[in-house]
Amino acid sequence: MTVLLSALAALLVGAGSAGAAPASIPAPAAAPAPALALTAGTPCAASADACVDLSSQQAWLTDGQGNVTYGPVGALGGTRKYPTPTGTFSVDYKDADHVSNLYDADMPYSVFFAPAIAFHTGSLSERSHGCIHLGKTASKRFFANLSPGDTVQVVS
């Protein structure tokens, strides 16, 4: 019996040093990427302060923690020639009485969040040159509630 155990021990010890490749141990699986938390009822991240869905032509104000505070409201973006950019942006500045120097157009209650792109009062039946048109009541609310540095997310 002792000889049998010694032979078995020699086989086990020698297997790792006899040039045979050790049995590979699978690496632990990478953890799946955490799902992006969305603001309920919107297609935008919970961290956004304003959300625009170009396909449904809606916009919302949120608290940046996943709760809608205003909306949905009608929101109309740009044309094919002048599309509204999608992505995540920061509010740059606000101008209640802005007049476009590019299109000589009044843009009341403008909240700029991308170069030459803003939320502002505008037609909900005529597309913009890339901005987000809101009705007057909604544009006043967006103007009052958004501040430079706030996050705006635009999805298509």
Map each language-model feature to its residues:
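Intrinsically disordered, low-complexity
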Residues: 2-90, 95-97, 154-156
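Exported/periplasmic cell-wall-interacting domains
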Residues: 34-49, 79-88, 93-156
